[in-house]
Amino acid sequence: MSVIKEYRTVSEVVGPLMIVDQVAGVHFNELVEIQLHDGSKRQGQVLEVQEDKAMVQLFEGSSGINLEKAKVRFTGRPLELPVSEDMVGRIFNGMGKPIDGGPAILPEKYLDIDGQAINPVARDYPDEFIQTGISAIDHLNTLVRGQKLPVFSGSGLPHKELAAQIARQATVLNSDENFAVVFVAMGITFEEAEFFMNDLRETGAIDRSVLFINLANDPAIERIATPRIALTAAEYLAYEKDMHVLVIMTDMTNYCEALREVSAARREVPGRRGYPGYLYTNLSTLYERAGRLVGKKGSVTQIPILSMPEDDITHPIPDLTGYITEGQIILSRELYNSGYRPPINVLPSLSRLKDKGSGEGKTRGDHAATMNQLFAAYAQGKQAKELAVVLGESALSETDKLYVRFTDRFEQEYINQGFQTNRTIEESLDLGWELLSILPRTELKRIKDDMIDQYLPQTKEEER
């Protein structure tokens, strides 16, 4: 049993950090309880121990703390989350406390929010298709169960609408196993929080979801704990309750800003653009908690969403995220300004595991071929449009004009499906064939003839 030690030796409080002197037997990540002179209590966590001094990060802010009268208790255990299957359908704050007016959770157990390291040998390869209902993802950048696939957005782009759409529509095809969504929002405004909660309530998606909401006016230090708390809940549902769990985390940029704020308070030597030098390592402790385990039915799939400052994909946050994750979905400001929703730019987007989750028995036999042909045709159509801007449309061949027509319809009908349309993978594939029928059959060089005979709409082919 852990021994609780109490001290009244607080020597300094700087921002979200507290220094406690003359401590003994204190450990890194240990949970700390602070009792103020008015009897109120706050929580913190040991961030660093040097000789007889402990640095504590405070989850609820440092205002109102009297150095002489504050009592600090070291509990001897890490920060833990009470977990239960009853968490599904509930809404929590950033520290895992219910905020939906419902009863407290009766925990089956308490789990360390930092989780357990997963042995690479124990990992199972991701290979099962997850349908999001969004053609640009399902067909062209397929999401696979156990994958981590981030969304790179920008300020003012509709990533919150995209996140809500995925939370509503995502499902594992051809599976009778339970599916759950863990939705974690960090540093969002009250209006954004209301949007997410109302959207999931109105559509009924709340019944299979767990929400963790950290508001912009909550302490920055809480923002660092929020994704770890959410991932702990996801791992519990996946590995102990055999559920397929999709974790949507928005906005990771707010998380990294909080990390930079705490690093500055600790007076650490800054790295690129003021972020701590351990930003990559810290992000990996979140992203690497996705995956499947050998012998376990459940899985954890991640969609981290981040807004790129100044739309700069070389910024440290998207740059380091791209190194750790398995692809990226990129939102385009140009498509957004043209009125396309969701404005997914499919050409620079990538899912590195898309070939593992597609094909006969998973989606359909023509998935990979049509995906490659759509990419090639869209790229060629974009080039033709750029050429027409420079030289005029008269410089285009008849085939080039067909590619331009294909590109326009691809953006208007395929990408621009709206935030309320839920397309099955079959509907996305059929729409792809309909668009490809605009082009001459001789241009469909990435698809086998027997597949063209089977799927290409005959009426369109006869018209040409």
From Swiss-Prot:
InterPro entries: ATP-synt_VA_C, ATPase_a/bsu_AS, ATPase_F1/V1/A1_a/bsu_N, ATPase_F1/V1/A1_a/bsu_nucl-bd, P-loop_NTPase, V-ATPase_su_B/beta. One of its GO terms (biological process) is proton motive force-driven plasma membrane ATP synthesis. CDD domains: ATP-synt_V_A-type_beta_C, ATP-synt_V_A-type_beta_N, V_A-ATPase_B. Transmembrane segments: none annotated. GO terms for molecular function: ATP binding; proton-transporting ATP synthase activity, rotational mechanism. Keywords: ATP synthesis, Hydrogen ion transport, Ion transport, Transport. Belongs to the ATPase alpha/beta chains family. Produces ATP from ADP in the presence of a proton gradient across the membrane. The V-type beta chain is a regulatory subunit. HAMAP family: ATP_synth_B_arch. This is V-type ATP synthase beta chain. It comes from Streptococcus sanguinis (strain SK36). The gene is atpB.
